Amino acid sequence: MSYTIYLVEDEDNLNELLTKYLENEGWNITSFTKGEDARKKMTPSPHLWILDIMLPDTDGYTLIKEIKAKDPDVPVIFISARDADIDRVLGLELGSNDYISKPFLPRELIIRVQKLLQLVYKEAPPVQKNEIAVSSYRVAEDAREVYDENGNIINLTSKEFDLLLLFIHHKGHPYSREDILLKVWGHDYFGTDRVVDDLVRRLRRKMPELKVETIYGFGYRMMSS
C-alpha cells in the first residue's frame, strides 16, 4: 500500500538520503528542512511523521504538540543527535511512537517505519481526512488525486476530476448534459453537448467501478456505492 510520510530533517544530505531510502519502499515522501514549512502541511495528516528534534527555527517537541493537537492518532518517530534518556521520555510523553538516535543506518529507520506502519494501520492505510471513499477508490479532493484499491494514482484530466467531484458530491442527482456543460466547462463554452458523453466515457474507462448511470435522452447520475 502507498503510505504518505512527512520527514522533517534540517541536515540537507541526511534529508536527501533518508528521502531516497523511504521512496525506494514505495512510500510517498514529503520532506522539510524547516519546522515552519512543515507547519503549513499539517492538514491533512500524513500516515506518519518523522521528526528531527533539533531544527533551525523550532524543535521537534513544539512540532509534535501542534501535530497531535490537529490529529492525536497520527504516529510520530523522533530522530535526534542526542541520546539522552530525558529526550526519549519527553518524546513518549508528548505522543511519539519511537525514537532513533544519530548516527544510524538508514535501513534501521526503514525497519522501524515498516513495523510502526504495520502496527498502526494493519493492512491498508486509513482514508485521510481530506479523502473521499467511493466504490473501491480514494479521492483526495485538495490534492486532486485519485487512488485505486492498491494505492496507485489514477491519472485524470482536470475536467475528468471536476466531473468526478460533481458526481461524488451529488450522488443520486440526475444531471442533464446541459447542466454538466455549465458546471464543468462554464458559461464560456460554445459547442456540442456531446463532449459530455466523451468525458463520461473516459471517466468510466479509467474508473470502471464507478456507478455512473446513463439517463437516456437526458444525461447522467452517479448512484450510491
Swiss-Prot record:
InterPro entries: CheY-like_superfamily, OmpR/PhoB-type_DNA-bd, Sig_transdc_resp-reg_C-effctor, Sig_transdc_resp-reg_receiver, WalR-like, WH-like_DNA-bd_sf
Alphabetic keyword roster: Cytoplasm, DNA-binding, Phosphoprotein, Transcription, Transcription regulation, Two-component regulatory system
Record-annotated Response regulatory domain positions: 4-117
Predominant cellular place of this UniProt entry's protein: cytoplasm
One of the GO biological process terms: regulation of DNA-templated transcription
Molecular function terms, GO-annotated: phosphorelay response regulator activity; transcription cis-regulatory region binding
Gene Ontology CC terms, in alphabetical order: cytosol; protein-DNA complex
CDD domains tied to this protein: REC_OmpR, trans_reg_C
Subcellular location: Cytoplasm
Keyword Oxidoreductase among record annotations: no
DNA-binding region: 129-224
Role summary: Member of the two-component regulatory system CssS/CssR required to control the cellular response to secretion stress.
Official protein name in the record: Transcriptional regulatory protein CssR
Organism: Bacillus subtilis (strain 168)
Protein encoded by which gene: cssR
